[in-house]
Amino acid sequence: MIRTEEMLLNVGPQHPSTHGVFRLIIKIDGETIKEATPVIGYLHRGTEKIAESLQYTQIIPYTDRMDYLSAMTNNYVICHAVETMMGLEIPERAEYLRVLAMELGRVASHLVWWGTNLLDIGAVSPFLYAFREREMVINLLNELCGARLTFNYMRVGGVKWDAPDGWIQKVREFVPYMKEQLKGYHDLVSGNEIFVNRVKGIGIYSAEEAISYSLSGANLRCTGVKWDIRKDEPYSIYNQFDFDVPVGEVGDAWDRYMCRMAEIEESLKIIEQAAEQFPKEGSVMAKVPRIIKVPKGEAFVRIESPRGEIGCYIASEGKKEPYRLKFRRPSFYNLQILPKLLKGENIANLITILGGVDIVLGEVDG
């Protein structure tokens, strides 16, 4: 009989697989994980408290730095909350630009996840392909707003800049190219026996457990729960587009992988439709006072980000700054199930499970 001894092992706070400052204290017995304790807060910047002393427009750049892989959806959620409280009607052209920006951002975010997750478990080539395509998306967004990562593009009432000449055509050309690349991704990885063995049956949880942990996004849909805010509680102009909500079956790492890959395809459908229906003329900004004062009251809105359900709560006293601002950050909630998933697993599966949850530490810590 082999004698083993329990020992504590620190993963992070600076470890390549965490893609940020995140510490995981694991208790192992041989190669089996007995207990896992996440330690967060290394990237906490007090965004919500800072916002209490900022005007509403000044808050937008701070949202870029929460989920910095999906800054457009973060920009939108704060604008959407303020617009809801003010009862603003957004110009149609602005709404189309918002949707195009958010869905391009969703594609770019999932490409980063695909490439880095596979790199973490030993596949180098997909990382290079993913960042090749992501660079094309980032260049499109750069042309639109002059930034590559932290965009600060959306405004209360619309967007800062109209699309430059020829931009919509470039978006149209990108869609068929990306669809073709996705087929190559599946040929390279999804049908690879080694990869399938690394993810099938790993990190399983049920739909009931997902709901009890308040999971959202692909982490919820992988269990078979068909819930997407864009479809079930449409905001902006999402009700004008035809797209599906991909779901999994058993809630393992394979289902999470396939859900996100399918989500890229659905985002491309939305982008294609939005580019075809894009209004030929019109304003990109509603008439909004330079100094925004939100009526007294409170509101909560939620939208679908690449990581899941991001929400924004605002309490206003009728001033130019919020009395209280609170974000529901999906990565923070999705992370909570990690200790349960890791308990009893082989240590070799740790990186696979962590990568499948797809957290962004700027969003976890806030």
Swiss-Prot record:
Membrane association type: Peripheral membrane protein
GO cellular component: plasma membrane
The entry's keywords: Cell membrane, Membrane, NAD, Quinone, Translocase, Transport
A GO molecular-function annotation: NAD binding
InterPro entries: NADH_Q_OxRdtase_suD, NDH1_su_D/H, NiFe-Hase_large
Pfam families (UniProt xref): Complex1_49kDa
EC numbers, comma separated: 7.1.1.-
Keyword Ribonucleoprotein set for record: no
Keyword Membrane assigned: yes
UniProt-annotated location(s): Cell membrane
Catalytic reaction list: a quinone + NADH + 5 H(+)(in) = a quinol + NAD(+) + 4 H(+)(out)
Annotated function: NDH-1 shuttles electrons from NADH, via FMN and iron-sulfur (Fe-S) centers, to quinones in the respiratory chain. The immediate electron acceptor for the enzyme in this species is believed to be a menaquinone. Couples the redox reaction to proton translocation (for every two electrons transferred, four hydrogen ions are translocated across the cytoplasmic membrane), and thus conserves the redox energy in a proton gradient.
Family, per entry: Belongs to the complex I 49 kDa subunit family.
HAMAP family cross-referenced by the UniProt entry: NDH1_NuoD
Subunit structure: NDH-1 is composed of 14 different subunits. Subunits NuoB, C, D, E, F, and G constitute the peripheral sector of the complex.
Protein name per its UniProtKB record: NADH-quinone oxidoreductase subunit D
Organism: Bacillus cytotoxicus (strain DSM 22905 / CIP 110041 / 391-98 / NVH 391-98)
Gene name in the database record: nuoD
